Amino acid sequence: GSYKPNSLFIKRAKENENLKDVIFCNISFGDANSMVKELENLKIDTQNLIFSQVVSSYTNTSIKAVQEYQTLMKKYFPNAELGFLSFEAFLSSKILVNAISRITGDITREKLLLTLKTTPNNLLDGIPLEYKNSQLLNKTYLFEYKNRQFIELTNEK
């Protein structure tokens, strides 16, 4: 994935005296979990890293969809690490399976797209869905990596 070149860029930048304290922001497709692990393996400081995600924290068990994700991962993949990428894939799979199950008759591209556009807002138990701009997840979450965990950055004081 793109985390390796991103990690290499951050490594080289942090080795430069003029850039070592710069704040870096990685976009969600860059796999935050793998990037942090790569930087830690390279013995690079993981301070001043911000990650954007289209999903909430995979550790926030106050959200029912997170509880379900964690339960199923432990059951079927007990040795796998939890992460943003697998959580996003889990949510996407739930949406897709729901859409396919609501199609009557033959499954066609047109029917699938129409059904995806009418996904119930509450399907993901605590994660709001609304179809607009050709997507269902419309919130962006920002996290910083601190004390070996991802902490959500919020506007709240």
Task: List the predicted regions and their residue ranges.
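A conserved active-site cap/scaffold subdomain adjacent to cofactor or substrate pockets
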Residues: 1-7
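Residue-level structural signal for beta-strand termini and adjacent loop
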Residues: 155-156
